[in-house]
């Protein structure tokens, strides 16, 4: 897995660094872009940072300049760089980094070695054929021609064997140079080898019998073909630097022509006159220029594609590593809020943005319909709903006794720190006891065992968890000098588990058994675990168990109605004589778990900095004598080493490792960060409870390195880039993909098509897509720019060959044939048109008209491009053959020169590497067969003349009469020898062309495949990051996530935050468990909550944060994002937005009821504002929550409110009334800790009647609703409140609270007065004076006052 530097490279940052072509640090420019904080904006995923702008071409984008006299701006067009990270030395294409260049040469070495071996095979095969040719025809002594060729064949065998040694891998460049010089020497030596008489043959036809001393063994066509082959091998397979190859090639051409002219065969090829000598030299020079132009082009493009492919494959490997990290990041992020089995289902839909997924959920499959027997079926499509019923699940609720008193004199930051510390211990213990943490509600902590994955020992897990929590809080009190205790309740039964809503979702459980478990905690005793009879049935006698005696302790009044005769028990600990499971005790006593052979050197999440230390491991081995083994679960524990303790103090094994990591002196220490933000290790990926906070800190820390040190980047840029390149090299060296990629390409070895048919179709349409998308040209490897270079080379070769052909007529003082002129004119028009279209397609595609753009897109298709390419690549050959006339048969210079030009026309088919090699090689074969046909076919219509052009070889007369041929027979060369030599020449040349075309197409396809793989990985990573962002926004607010990147914890005080609690008050009447345990009822509730969540996606409500859902209660707040508050026109503008949101929730419920056939839900809303504290609690499962009296009062405004109306406090009334809202004064209610409070109701009654009595009565407590919710307030326990009515209407009803649910039938279509006018909505009053109230934090002694039970339980 990736190391921390790799993490730094994975997460892009907003610092841009660029330099000039020289890479001088003095010219480095640093640009820091501001972070985009909008949750809806996603930065475009950039390529791996190895692709920097520090290249030889500088800024390829160009500088805008004004065109003409108008105001139109056009970018200045510049040539792109050779390849990404190319050096400024164009004459030696290399990377600008030594590390990258060495890695590229190392990774490309299999391809280099393979091509060099192919070159040895070709050279050896050519030597063998020429040896056979000379030996058969006895054109020279064997010792002169055959022996050197055979000796060189043995040398090639030696070179081939040398390629299998390690010495060749280190010195393959010197080996190529040595072979090149040997080939040069051998081929140049053949230039001055003359024909020598051979005894033993008396026939007059023997060529050597009457040979002159100046007659050479090879014709000019044969020797020129050998020159072409040598030069092409030099430029394509010898792998020497470009400047060295070019110098050697030019030197070889000069020596070749020098030797060839000096040892010219005067008998067959008389020297031209003095006037025509300069035309001869110019023509030969142009032919050699064509060879070098084609060779340099092939060399450069081969290097460009090779290095581009290396970068693409390297980026693909890096993106593969990124993909692993992003996948682990996303998995651990979602596992931090829900179990793995539930997360896997949710991950399937996480590939969409939250707002898009909401729309998709609204139109989901119609199969998800209401299935409750008492509800009539209706054609309503539900959102995806993941909830399942599980039996035999143990539920644990734990409450901190004395928390109100402890928090009375604590600041917000201190309180959040204490809760984070304490709940961190519980999270660690929950993980070790195999329980699944559900959530925290204020100071309440609850978890389950046997859900969502069944466990046979679920009851033992919860009991051990409860006992461990009691011990953990005892240690907490000793360390923090506090006086708090734990009250734990456990019950076993059936639950519904799943997720409700579309935003700020979390895994939760619901059922009546859940409520009963909550009741067990409320009726329990501090310091003991209160269990039900259902849980006791799953336990043996290992625990000290006593009767619960609930009635004796609390009385008969309400308990009998609550428990309904259920027997309860209290567990104080394990029996001393049979303590079977001691996991919690061992963890709390400073022991740590030993997992098999791997010794954990600290709590999970500390990374590998200490676990890999040999001294730490040795210290741990010394403690094996003190090992402890749990008799129940078999877990082995060892004493924790003192090195892991902080400052030598005894460490708590269940305590989170960074409870004190934020020191005033040092701040957060990366080494002691949570495990999720440390470099992800393989053994940590299976952990289902890890910290999201660590993920955010890791991303922020590594992404912020360059931001924090941006001022030093100009001086350290080179060092940073070297380290980056070194890390890039280290990563790709560990991956086998690079070697397999070059040595085993994913293509068919015969057809060269991709093995994947879909990839092959994509490859054939890639060029057209480049044109359609108008993709920018960045490097020479770009398909459109590569085509431009091919067309330019084709035009150059065509003009050069045409010029040399016309020069021969100038030298011979013969007018050129009309056919050649016509072909030249038409071909030149095609070449110029193709060149103009290519330039237009590369640089000015955005300026063409629509019709021209469609034409260019059609031309870029696979078949049209091949047809046009076949024409362009054949134009040089067509131009050469257009000069073949009857003069070709009489003047020896014409067939020799035409044959030489035809050789260049054949090798020109190595151009246009984007086209099929089969097509180009086949066309080259057809063109190569042309000279062979011309040698044996006469073009002269008179049969009495020479029968074929081969007869012209036997005529050395300077006469141009085609019907006069008198050559002494003893000086004539046999025509068959020239024909056989030409056949051998073209066969070897075509063999080289077929080989090079195949290699170059493979190289081009590899480059495309590397690009596709890199883009595919980038797309996957971007999708992963989008999913992670989507999940992140649904776990905690975006601005909180940004803060957690740089801070260990998050807590913030807000002076004026708005809070609402909205409850579906009659959901208990709708809820039934007689069908699928009430699952379909919660499906309906999920739809309603989803509609509420959909409101939050509107821009008008962007300042509102959903906090949580508690059963059928929806909690939201505003004013928590200080950045948005500063942008607002008034500090209290968010309160108006929150109130409008509450009104919109009322409308949503009315619309929802219109689709219900028999039941109408009723919404009750409580509103309050004031100072509050927002923070993130937890270490393995984070929870964003808010605390304070403001939250408590808002909860009371809901629980004491009125159906279908919004109840607000007096402080909120003063603010909202000045915004134009009209309220009814209700009276006063008793709020715990606040006494009597005046409240107001919205909307105001329109008939000026007083409020009915049934609206003044107290609604059932949210904590004990029968809707299956756990119903606990986010802070302290909710008291049983009795309001004090200020005034009562004469006609008020006298209904009591027992009949409230039946009498409360408010009309859902109550006429509401619109209180806010357009001109008044933006007007706000001055600061609101608040009443001074004494804060009381003393808990009520009698726990019964917290129970408000309805008869329906």
UniProtKB/Swiss-Prot annotation:
SUPFAM superfamilies named among the record's database cross-references: Nucleotide cyclase
Positions bound to Mg(2+) 2: 399-400, 443
Region (Disordered): 1-27, 49-71, 349-375, 642-684, 1292-1326
Residues bound to Mg(2+) 1: 399, 443
SMART domains: CYCc
Cofactor(s) required, per the database record: Mg(2+); Mn(2+)
Gene3D superfamilies per record: Nucleotide cyclase
Biased composition (Polar residues): 16-27, 1292-1301
Membrane topology (Extracellular): 139-141, 193-215, 260-280, 808-818, 889-891, 942-975
A Pfam entry, by short name: Guanylate_cyc
Residue numbers binding ATP: 399-404, 441-443, 487, 1108, 1185-1187, 1192-1196, 1232
Tissue distribution of the protein: Detected in skeletal muscle, pancreas, lung, heart, kidney, liver, brain and placenta. Expressed in multiple cells of the lung, with expression highest in airway smooth muscle.
EC number(s) reported in the record: 4.6.1.1
GO terms for cellular component: axon; ciliary basal body; cilium; cytosol; dendrite; membrane; plasma membrane
Main location: membrane
Localization of this protein: Cell membrane
Biased composition (Basic residues): 359-374
GO biological process assignments: adenylate cyclase-activating adrenergic receptor signaling pathway; adenylate cyclase-activating G protein-coupled receptor signaling pathway; cAMP biosynthetic process; in utero embryonic development; intracellular signal transduction; signal transduction
Description of its domains: The protein contains two modules with six transmembrane helices each; both are required for catalytic activity. Isolated N-terminal or C-terminal guanylate cyclase domains have no catalytic activity, but when they are brought together, enzyme activity is restored. The active site is at the interface of the two domains. Both contribute substrate-binding residues, but the catalytic metal ions are bound exclusively via the N-terminal guanylate cyclase domain.
Family: Belongs to the adenylyl cyclase class-4/guanylyl cyclase family.
Function: Adenylyl cyclase that catalyzes the formation of the signaling molecule cAMP in response to activation of G protein-coupled receptors. Contributes to signaling cascades activated by CRH (corticotropin-releasing factor), corticosteroids and beta-adrenergic receptors.
Name of the protein in question: Adenylate cyclase type 9
